Amino acid sequence: MKKTKTVLSVIAVLVVFVLAFGLITRLLTPKYATDLVEGGMIAEYYDEEKNHDVIFIGDCEVYSNFSPMEMYRQQGITAYVRGTSQQLIWQSYYILKETLKYETPKVVVYNVNAMRYDEPIKEEFHRLTIDEMRWSEEKVGIIQASMTEEETFASYVFPILRYHSRFQHLTSEDFTYLFRDKDNTFNGYLMKKEVLPVEKLPAKRPLASYEFGEKCYDYLEKMTQLCKEHGVELVLIKAPSLYPYWYEQHDAQIQDFASKHGLAYYDLTRQIETIGLDFTQDTYDAGLHLNLSGATKLSGYFGKLLVENHGLEDRRNELEIATIYDEKLRLYDEAAK
């Protein structure tokens, strides 16, 4: 009897410790609800109905520029954007791999901007992509592929090792969203209504090298093979930003890769006039990304390409889909006012 009480006491202490440790960890971990909201976008996908015809993968050039709500409104396409800030191609690969465990879209659209970056860049950006992923084989892989020399795997398993110093810098957000999350996107699209027109772009200077790195090509090959194994069409794009410059040499390399692998590739930087973009009105940061006005134009244009060239169908007459998206559009239009 005494032994049983001792065991129960030990269990009770362990339970209290685990709960307290979990609560403190949650308190100190960034909430990404009202500040640095880009860090919370990856997790919003998990609560979605997994019935999308199109999945966008990539960096800020997808979550800022492509609005699934407009693609549904204009073409009846169901799409989701799994984009994060400065998402590197090996991160895109693992996010794609995870996504294909949840659903099998008809088309995956990958923005090739990250082909420029062959090495990990900044730990802070990695966190925005990785922290809110659910634990899985893919999360382990993305951590191992992304860590800088200064990072440790343990800091991802136990975020308190990374964020313990936030104790002195807690804000009201940390308490308001301690037990709940806040959705900030519309199917992965982060709406920006501000206007900051292009006034002057930096000089277009020659680069020391235009060649994409071997590591980037390896992961693009892996993404191509992964889509093929799942019967998904991979479409490559370069979003229509004015800066950083997408050089002709960059474009030629992607054209060559797409041709060799039988993939469609759209360099939308060359379609700016056709799309109807006006960078005195359609950008919120002087030409790097599109605002709501620009995203509406681009999404309608690209949605039409997907219908005409990739066999996507109008799903607005499907009752279940219409019920879901009518409510999504109501919230989207309310936010757009």
Stretches found by the model and what they are:
Residues 27-50:
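Alpha-helical transmembrane signal-anchor/signal-peptide segments
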Residues 107-119, 178-274:
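Conserved, well-ordered alpha-helix/loop/beta-strand core segments that scaffold catalytic motifs
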Residues 125-230, 316-337:
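Secreted/periplasmic serine-hydrolase-like ester/acetyl group-modifying domain
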Residues 5-26:
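Hydrophobic membrane-insertion alpha-helices, especially the h-region
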Residues 79-85, 208, 212, 287:
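Acidic/histidine-rich helix-loop elements
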Residues 57, 61-144:
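Membrane-embedded segments
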Residues 248-324, 331-337:
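C-terminal regions of proteins
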Residues 38-42, 64-65, 94-98, 217-223, ...:
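Alpha-helical scaffolding within the catalytic cores
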